[in-house]
Design a protein with these regions (language model features):
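Beta-strand scaffold of nucleotide-dependent catalytic cores
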Residues: 57-60, 84-86
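Short polybasic amphipathic segments
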Residues: 73, 87-100
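Short acidic/polar mixed-charge low-complexity motifs
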Residues: 24, 52-54, 78-81, 157
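C-terminal substrate-binding/catalytic lobe of Rossmann-fold NAD(P)-dependent oxidoreductases
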Residues: 49, 66-70, 76-86, 117-118
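A general structural signal for well-ordered alpha-helical segments in protein cores
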Residues: 12-13, 117-121, 146-147
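C-terminal helix-rich "cap/oligomerization" subdomain common to oxidoreductases
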Residues: 51, 122-161
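Active-site loop of classical SDR/Rossmann-like NAD(P)-dependent oxidoreductases
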Residues: 107-121
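Rossmann-like dinucleotide-binding domain that binds NAD(P)(H)
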Residues: 1-55, 61-66, 70
């Protein structure tokens, strides 16, 4: 198995790359903390730079010491920002930051569970040939980034892709 980055970071890198429409990765820099006597990392800090000036930073840890567990995903741009857990969207309107978070009808099922239900429905639709199969080219890019992050951490330097 992998450490914290492979376990928790891979889905975050996948989400970030997907939201950005899988831009071509250019370079990766990573630092991973592997306590003595262990083969896997407890924490990782990874920076990924892609084409078009898009950059991502991932801070992943199994060893967070604090009062409560923290998880968030945030995207920033010159026109606004968005954050998950809970969803919050801020956009500049009339020169001021304005909360434009979508409100919706409350449901009995949370968004996390809804996402799994949607993923399963999509999978079944592909198996039944109701939806075209998508080639895994995005996942090949994702795994090249993950591999480059581990190589960067091992060698202590940036890895160009």
């Amino acid at each position: 198995g992998g450490g914290a980055f492979f376990d928790q970071g891979l889905p975050m890198v996948d989400l970030a790359m997907w939201l950005a429409d899988f831009p071509a990765p250019l370079r990766v820099w990573a630092h991973m903390d592997r306590p003595r006597g262990t083969a896997v990392e407890e924490s990782a800090l990874v920076t990924l730079e892609c084409e078009s000036g898009i950059a991502f930073t991932f801070d992943i840890s199994w060893a967070y010491v604090g009062y409560e567990e923290r998880w968030w995903f945030e995207t920033l741009s010159s026109r606004g920002s968005a954050r998950l857990a809970p969803l919050r969207v801020v956009k500049e309107l009339n020169g001021k930051p304005t909360d434009v978070s979508p409100g919706g009808a409350a449901t009995r099922e949370n968004s996390f569970n809804q996402s799994y239900r949607a993923e399963l429905a999509h999978f079944l639709s592909v198996v039944r040939e109701e939806t075209p199969y998508e080639a895994p080219s995005d996942q090949v890019i994702l795994h090249k980034v993950i591999e480059a992050a581990y190589k960067s951490a091992d060698e202590g330097k940036e890895v160009k892709l």
